[in-house]
Amino acid sequence: MAESPITTFTPNGGQSGEGPTVQQQKQMESAYANMRRKMAMQEIGRKIKHKIMVLSGKGGVGKSTVSTGLALSLAQQGHAVGILDIDITGPNVPKMMGLEGKRLHVEQGRIHPAQGHLGVKVISMAFLLEDEDTPVVWRGPIKLGAIQQFIGDVEWGELDYLVIDFPPGTSDEPLTVAQSLPDIDGMVIVTTPQDVALLDSRKSITFSESLKVPVLGVVENMSGYT
């Protein structure tokens, strides 16, 4: 009497030997892509000597102006510098760098930054928009995925400094960058003399302490207007 074949079942209810379902295949591909991007971010982080985060607790205090000025000042001293504009919904760095209308170049799956004055390399969401009036209406997970792509899929090359310009507030964006890029050197906090701006800057300092990222300095912008 012939023995009955033994059939085993996978956790999703399918028989072994059938191969992964379409959903499982997508999950595996997504997990592999995330793992590969994480490794790429770590490798890129090792090629960048210094990484500086520029934050503000409140909008309209001149944070992007400070980021751009800091990057250009470092470039004037002979350093290789890049600016990563993480403000997905309000990217202003390309306009300040005279790079309006530029587009990013992609080669062999790697994004090449635009180059501005003094050779400063720039990555920004603005380069992907049809025009400056186009809004970016994305939910959090999509924004965070774009940020990780801006870090892991960009060919920054060897940099002395990467200046990272964030949107106002202490939301997911700085947390994502701090977790994605190893060895952040420090944070520059931009504020104005108004009481509400100073209150928000104190929140930014507390936020930096929670990330264990040292505060390099606090810039009081527009102090001559009070």
Outline where the language-model segments fall.
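Extreme N-terminal, non-catalytic leader segments
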Residues: 1-58
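Residue-level signature of catalytic and energy-coupling elements of molecular machines
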Residues: 48, 59, 85, 93, ...
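Walker A/P-loop phosphate-binding motif and the immediately C-terminal alpha-helix
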Residues: 51-88, 201, 205
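Short glycine/serine/threonine-rich phosphate/pyrophosphate-binding segments
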Residues: 61-69, 90-94, 169-174, 196-200
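Short, well-ordered alpha-helices that flank and scaffold nucleotide-derived cofactor binding pockets
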Residues: 72, 76, 152, 179
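Phosphate-binding loop that captures ATP/GTP phosphates
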Residues: 80-82, 86-133, 137, 144, ...
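Phosphate-binding/switch loop-helix module in NTP-utilizing enzymes
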Residues: 129-177
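Conserved catalytic-core segment of NTP-binding enzymes
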Residues: 160-226
